[in-house]
A protein has these predicted regions:
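Alpha-helical membrane-protein architecture signal
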Residues: 130, 167-170, 205, 234, ...
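Peripheral, non-transmembrane regulatory/ligand-interaction domains of membrane transport proteins
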Residues: 1-197, 201-202, 211, 215-222, ...
């Protein structure tokens, strides 16, 4: 799906392309790709790079075209292997043509358009738009991090009532998401540090870049803190599981010892040897009493040693 936006003031939709407008392409169809490649003559590998979910944040030039790939947050199904991840957003520019391409429909881009319309100021130029996309991505990383923290706290509350596989698996998935976040944020920071020297930055852009740096730093540090907390939490519950397993094995071993003693005594009295009790009518009762006494003493000893 493609949309032509007039970047002046309230960001209105245009019926067709005009010079210096913004072409927003989301989940591009074959027709959209042909339009970009045939009409605007952008390098064909630009789109293939943007469609690669593992493409790192970077920029490059080819035949007058500039390609910027920014990593932005994206939410899958909550029960998926990595519910929160990042996807590439491509920014393509040449003279009076500015195009953004994303192969996923993200809340960030929807909110970006809505927010710019509320500002009712538009973009001063394509450089202003690029850095505002950086700012929006940082803000949305922070929003997603709050959601991740909420899920972590929920899983921890469930684990406080009893360790279960579902909550532990959920924490493991969130750890994977935080790994994707921290890697992408660092990549975006490196990209930003390079672009501010490559693009024509005016005084307003410099102020905007400072805001982006602040938000990016906060997002990176928050992700790092949550990742450390989650790792510590996982280690704690792993220790609890190991401790519970050791306690269970110790208890079972102690019970086995207590149960073994009557069997041992019965075996001794049951041997074909002279023991003075083979002809006594009280032999069985005597063996039974000894078994009970020995078992009780062993039980008391193990309880005293806190092995039961």
């Amino acid at each position: 799906m493609k949309t032509f936006w007039n970047i002046d003031k309230n960001l209105t939709v245009l019926n067709e392309w005009q010079p210096n407008c913004w072409i927003q392409v989301t989940c591009p169809t074959d027709e959209d790709q042909r339009l970009l490649e045939d009409e605007f003559k952008i390098p064909d590998y630009f789109l293939s790079d943007i469609s690669d979910t593992d493409e790192r944040a970077r920029y490059e030039y080819d035949d007058g075209w500039m390609l910027i790939i920014l990593r932005i947050p994206y939410v899958k199904e909550i029960r998926s292997r990595t519910p929160y991840t990042t996807v590439p957003l491509g920014i393509i520019h040449k003279r009076d043509v500015t195009i953004t391409v994303c192969y996923y429909e993200t809340n960030m881009m929807i909110d970006f358009v809505s927010y710019q319309q509320k500002r009712n100021e538009g973009f001063t130029d394509y450089v202003d738009m690029i850095f505002r996309l950086f700012l929006s991505s940082a803000v949305w990383y922070l929003k997603r991090l709050k959601q991740i923290n909420s899920l972590i706290e929920k899983a921890k509350r469930n684990l406080d009532h009893g360790v279960n596989n579902e909550s532990l698996i959920g924490l493991s998935r969130l750890q994977d998401s935080l790994t994707y976040f921290i890697t992408s944020i660092r990549g975006n920071e490196n990209l930003l540090s390079k672009l501010k020297f490559k693009l024509q930055v005016d005084e307003l852009d410099a102020d905007l870049i400072e805001d982006v740096n602040i938000e990016m730093t906060q997002a990176r540090e928050t992700t790092s803190i949550y990742s450390d907390i989650l790792e510590s939490t996982m280690d704690t519950y792993s220790s609890i599981i190991n401790n519970n397993m050791n306690t269970t094995m110790r208890t079972l071993t102690s019970i086995s010892i207590v149960m073994m003693l009557p069997t041992l005594i019965s075996s001794l009295f049951g041997m074909n040897l002279l023991n003075g009790m083979e002809n006594s009518p009280y032999g069985f009762a005597f063996a039974l009493i000894i078994s009970v006494i020995v078992s009780a003493l062993s039980w008391g000893f193990l309880r005293y040693k806190r092995l039961l």
